[in-house]
Amino acid sequence: MKAKDSLVDVPSKDLPILEPLQLFDADSSDMYFDVNLLEAKGIKTNDLFFVPSIEESDKLVLRAKTTDEGKYIEMKYKLEENYNVDFSLDFVGMENVIDGDDMFFNWQMKSLLTEKEAEGQSRMSSVFYKPKDEGRTYLSEMAEDSDDLESKTSWIAFKHCYFSSAVISEEGFKKGGNVFSAPIKTGKYSDEYKAKINVSTDIDNRTSIPMTFFFGPNDYKVLASHNNEMEDIIDLGWGIFRWTAKWLIKPIFNFLNGFNLAMGLIIVLVTLIVRLIILPLTYKNYKSSAKMKVLKPEITAINEKYKEGNAAEKQKETMALYRKTGVNPMAGCLPIFIQMPILLAVFRFFPSSIEMRQRSFLWAEDLS
């Protein structure tokens, strides 16, 4: 990641990257801390004057000085691997100046268009977040939505379709605050996001509030490297559909992708492999359907025989026919129910995969 705004280099096997992709810029994003002084409330860090200094090639320090050289507020940024930026807000010698209660980190952003269509990007964009002791959750991707953060939160992510901007706390942000998301789809923006995060703390002689920012692609391996379930930003569905996509479809996809094949060919091969996996179920379904077709004339005859007669007798004779021929009328339904999670997992997996983005195949310019 380059140390300029939010530029992200995304390598591709098939397509050259002509220019860095920009998730947001100075006009579309605003982040600041609400800080309360013991003698005054409502100070915003973006109203303070910070003096920058570069300690190392990958480290930036911003310092807001006071009239006392031993008292200052400092922000430290350090570029790390996997699109991460380590950050800390430090209060030095401010224990008699700063009130650590009701301190919040505010982040507001309008998502720049990164895809060809604002409508399509907005449908796959929202605010995702993970309560410390629960699974990830998210706001509506289709309409304006908001939620209160009622428990500790591990991370909050502004998802821009195939990319995300996130803030992470190893210990978990304290309960309190809220998140907001709304599609706007106007001009160069697709969505608007807001997060108000509780970072209240006790202020002593040297207090540090650490967190990590992530600005990068929604790549499963990259997100999973955080070891905090951030990979769940990639929406593969829910329940058994998600489980099937994660533990069946994705391993097959990763195996084939390791051979550097064209992405369109990989889609074809994954589809064929899945069809082979469910072939026994498909065969059983076809076999049951064939038997029912053979019996159709006899079933029709029974229906005509009891057209105005006893329904119980009709049912009894129909079941006797099934037993005599060894046909189970429900045998064709069970294979279909078993196949559904696999087929729907395939259907959900490909549109959610960043590997599809900007990959062409035959007449398709973009497989995503």
Describe the residue ranges of each PLM region.
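Soluble non-transmembrane domains of integral membrane proteins
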Residues: 1-232
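Helix-loop-helix
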Residues: 88-90, 101, 111-121, 155, ...
